[in-house]
């Protein structure tokens, strides 16, 4: 057979690995450890697409490489299986979300196994398994005991069609829900919150210790959003009311000409004049229909209403009209801002819109034309005049503190984590509300609080989840006869994914989240690979929970993930018409190398775009495995380009990778394998071992494969192949194409055992040194020949070889040699006349 028969070989070795538990996690305490983690998937009905295996292949290469280097390797996989999609599907079809999820998991697992990933399936976790979410609930009870889980009446992003509130991060820029694209409105509701803000400073500072890309760290820093400034208290004219504003620029107080409250601010109704009451009420209603993202969009038209009230500027006593505007959020800062229109563009636009005064307090711009937002010396600012920013801030803060109307303050953009969902398909929150007004956590001995099975999973629409309808589950009675009601909200999908990497370490422990010694052995995760779309939410939440567990003494490290790598996106093929509109692939035909719209005949431009069902350009890995084989898919996705780049899928590239594997197969199976080394491939082999080893370490898998190709080309020029080099090469390709490598290993090693734990090859540095070098021969300064000679020859030896060369002899025939200049390892110059 002269080609790689993937249909026969790949299932054979997948069966072998499963039967022999080849990838069971090592427990030899004398070995170093390596924990390679993938972001576990949500098991959707659509199954895997070709984007999933990119990251999975990367961690699999590292895991196979580290096993060969003698490491204990933990390489697990599991399922992030709670969440809205399964519940939405269940409501649409009448199916049980648990059954739907189980079917999807079985399909995902089949697809993953068909790709030859070396997961230890004994450590599989599923966030919907009560034995798993027992510990999710346990973590929640600990947060509750420490005051970090609390209830609050907060304005939430309510989605009527989903029957639930969603987090700010799940609202799209257009004001619709990420899931389903439904309208989002603001609605006050009783919600569970987690006090992530208590960890803001640690979450910020500890980023410096992590081997993550600066772009991801910056995204987290910006999300946490630390600001240093001052709280300033403004009294409301003619009343005993006052409100506080946080500002990073208290030095511009002399330029504050009006104040703006969030429409939801608690003072609004109390200070609104009777003349303005109707307009204020109308505006508050309109604001409630908008999401935070829409309200804070800098590009949107500025709207607002005057309350009829005035605030008193604490530094100059001037009256400042108090407005309400939807760009101020009650949930951010104090829900109030002091407007300095001369030096803030949004305030400037608002002032121009409503004809409010603009007072310059920093010199350097023309504030009639636009806000001046750079720094400058202070003007029109009484005792601050002539001062720079730093000096002015220090002086004004001292003044405010002396007057008792302000103080220095550090704030964070980060908000507490909205942790409850009004849905069925999630972890029940283990809290009981008693009729005497108290609430208690479900005792640890009664965990897990199991999600009851029901077919009635439609949201109540009242803000409670479907669990409110299940009386037998809902109502409880204490030993003293006091009646209670279970919490009906469930946890968000983020809950189970915030700690799953810990459970992999000890997945069958019934007594605790995980054994302390095992946690010490395996933490932190050595490399975590996944999409950059999780840069803020999942990673921030996981870091928060990890730090909390560190404070409890459960985990031994301050951070969960030492190294993070975000793979790029695999783009699909798409087509655009002359307007730039995307055209689905089933509407396109190819003629003479160009692409045309089947219906209109218009010639289309081919362009990469994100794979989507609507464009019909999603590539199913099942189809690729069937036609080309899993090893081809693995090699192709790693060879496409740098791992972190977004690159378009190419059928031609796939075929090229398949041809390469066929060449590898033929090289090993058709060459004569020598027991003795003839030295012909010394340099090529040792260069390949060195390069592939270093490139795997640095995740440059595309260049590692390119080097493997270089060796195949060199080896194909030889009639025979030294057996140790054949073995070493098979070991080098094994992390990339494990099925092919296992099969070829049997032909040269004849052990009958897997290649997985054979020691990784090493290189001989002395073999990397060139034995021969190329020198040039010049005659009267012009190059007439290039010769391969032994390295470090003397001048005399070089001269002798050059003069004996046939080409050189022909050039100097009949001429007198005046002089010969020899430069060892470089050139011979012959002067003739």
Swiss-Prot record:
GO terms for biological process: leucyl-tRNA aminoacylation. GO terms for molecular function: aminoacyl-tRNA deacylase activity; ATP binding; leucine-tRNA ligase activity. Its main location: cytoplasm. ATP binds at residue 613. It catalyses: tRNA(Leu) + L-leucine + ATP = L-leucyl-tRNA(Leu) + AMP + diphosphate. Keywords: Aminoacyl-tRNA synthetase, ATP-binding, Cytoplasm, Ligase, Nucleotide-binding, Protein biosynthesis. Its EC number is 6.1.1.4. It is an enzyme of class 6 (ligase). One of its GO terms (cellular component) is cytosol. Pfam families: Anticodon_1, tRNA-synt_1, tRNA-synt_1_2, tRNA-synt_1g. A motif ('HIGH' region) lies at residues 41-52. A motif ('KMSKS' region) lies at residues 610-614. Coiled coil: none annotated. It is found in: Cytoplasm. It comes from the Bacteria. InterPro entries: aa-tRNA-synth_I_CS, aa-tRNA-synth_Ia, Leu-tRNA-ligase, Leu_tRNA-synth_edit, M/V/L/I-tRNA-synth_anticd-bd, Methionyl/Leucyl_tRNA_Synth, Rossmann-like_a/b/a_fold, tRNAsynth_Ia_anticodon-bd. CDD domains: Anticodon_Ia_Leu_BEm, LeuRS_core. PANTHER family: LEUCINE--TRNA LIGASE, MITOCHONDRIAL, LEUCYL-TRNA SYNTHETASE. Belongs to the class-I aminoacyl-tRNA synthetase family. This is Leucine--tRNA ligase. The lineage of its organism: Bacteria, Bacillati, Bacillota, Bacilli, Lactobacillales.
């Amino acid at each position: 057979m002269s080609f790689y028969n993937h249909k026969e070989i790949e299932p054979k070795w997948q069966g072998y690995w499963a039967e022999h538990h080849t990838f069971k996690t090592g427990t030899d305490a004398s070995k170093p450890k390596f924990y390679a983690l993938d972001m576990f998937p949500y098991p959707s009905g659509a199954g895997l697409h070709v984007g999933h295996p990119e990251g999975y292949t990367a961690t699999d290469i590292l895991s196979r490489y580290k096993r060969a280097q003698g490491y204990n390797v933990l390489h697990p996989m599991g399922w992030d299986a709670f969440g809205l999609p399964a519940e939405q599907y269940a409501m649409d079809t009448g199916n049980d979300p648990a059954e739907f999820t189980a079917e999807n998991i079985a399909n995902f697992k089949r697809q993953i196994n068909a790709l030859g990933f070396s997961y230890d399936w004994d450590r599989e976790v599923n966030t919907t398994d009560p034995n798993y979410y027992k510990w999710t609930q346990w973590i929640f009870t600990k947060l509750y005991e420490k005051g970090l889980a609390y209830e609050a009446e907060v304005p939430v992003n309510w989605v009527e069609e989903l029957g639930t509130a969603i987090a700010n991060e799940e609202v799209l820029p257009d004001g619709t829900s990420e899931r389903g694209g439904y309208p989002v409105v603001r609605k006050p509701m009783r919600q569970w919150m987690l006090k992530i803000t208590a960890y803001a400073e640690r979450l910020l500072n500890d980023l410096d210790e992590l081997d993550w890309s600066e772009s991801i760290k910056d995204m987290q820093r910006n999300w946490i959003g630390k600001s240093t400034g001052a709280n300033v208290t403004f009294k409301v004219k003619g009343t005993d009311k006052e409100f506080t504003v946080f500002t990073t620029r208290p030095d511009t107080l002399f330029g504050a000409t009006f104040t703006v409250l969030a429409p939801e601010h608690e003072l609004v109704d109390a200070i609104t004049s009777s003349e303005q009451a109707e307009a204020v009420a109308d505006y508050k209603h309109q604001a409630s229909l908008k999401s935070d993202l829409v309200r804070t969009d800098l590009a949107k038209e500025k709207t607002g209403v005057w309350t009829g009230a005035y605030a008193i500027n604490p530094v100059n006593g001037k009256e400042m009209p108090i407005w309400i505007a939807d760009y101020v959020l009650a949930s951010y800062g104090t829900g109030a801002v002091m407007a300095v229109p001369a030096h803030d563009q949004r305030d400037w636009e608002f002032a121009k819109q409503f004809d409010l005064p603009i007072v310059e307090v920093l010199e350097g711009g023309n504030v009639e034309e636009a806000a001046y937002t750079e720094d400058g010396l202070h003007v029109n600012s009484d005792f601050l005049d002539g001062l720079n920013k730093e000096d002015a801030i220090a002086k004004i803060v001292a003044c405010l503190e002396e007057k008792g109307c302000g103080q220095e303050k550090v704030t964070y953009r980060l908000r507490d984590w909205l942790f409850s969902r009004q849905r069925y398909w999630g972890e029940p929150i283990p809290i009981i509300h008693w009729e005497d007004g108290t609430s208690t956590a479900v005792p640890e001995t009664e965990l897990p609080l199991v999600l009851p099975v029901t077919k009635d999973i439609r949201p109540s629409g009242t803000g409670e989840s479907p669990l409110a309808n299940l009386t037998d589950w809902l109502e409880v009675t204490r030993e003293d006869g006091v009646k209670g009601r279970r919490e009906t909200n469930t946890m968000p999908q983020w809950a189970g994914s915030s700690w799953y990497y810990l459970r992999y370490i000890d997945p069958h422990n019934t007594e605790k989240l995980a054994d302390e010694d095992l946690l010490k052995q395996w933490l932190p995760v050595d490399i975590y690979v996944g999409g950059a779309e999780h840069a803020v939410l999942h990673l921030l939440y996981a870091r928060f929970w990890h730090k909390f567990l560190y404070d409890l003494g459960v985990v031994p490290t301050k951070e969960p993930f030492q190294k993070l790598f975000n793979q790029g996106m695999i783009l699909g093929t798409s087509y655009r018409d002359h307007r730039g509109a995307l055209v689905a692939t089933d509407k396109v035909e190819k003629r003479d190398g160009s692409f045309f719209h089947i219906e209109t005949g218009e010639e289309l431009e081919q362009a990469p775009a994100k794979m989507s069902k609507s464009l019909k350009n999603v590539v199913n890995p099942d189809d690729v495995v069937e036609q080309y084989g899993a090893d081809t898919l693995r090699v192709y996705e790693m060879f496409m380009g740098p791992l972190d780049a977004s690159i378009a899928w190419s059928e031609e590239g796939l075929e090229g990778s398949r041809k390469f594997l066929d060449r590898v197969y033929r090289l090993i199976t058709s060459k004569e394998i020598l027991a003795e080394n003839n030295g012909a491939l010394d340099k090529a082999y040792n260069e390949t071992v060195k390069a592939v080893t270093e490139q795997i370490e640095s995740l440059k898998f595309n260049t590692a494969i390119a080097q493997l190709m270089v060796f195949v080309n060199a080896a194909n020029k030889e009639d025979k192949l030294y057996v140790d080099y054949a073995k070493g090469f098979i070991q080098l390709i094994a992390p990339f194409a494990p099925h092919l490598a296992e099969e070829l290993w049997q032909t040269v090693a004849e052990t009958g055992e897997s290649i997985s734990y054979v020691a990784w090859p090493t290189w001989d540095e002395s073999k990397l040194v060139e034995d021969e070098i190329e020198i040039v021969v010049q005659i009267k300064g012009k190059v007439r020949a290039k010769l391969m000679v032994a390295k470090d020859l003397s001048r005399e030896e070089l001269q002798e070889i050059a003069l004996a060369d046939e080409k050189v002899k022909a050039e100097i025939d009949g001429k007198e040699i005046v002089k010969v200049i020899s430069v060892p390892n470089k050139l011979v110059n012959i002067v003739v006349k």
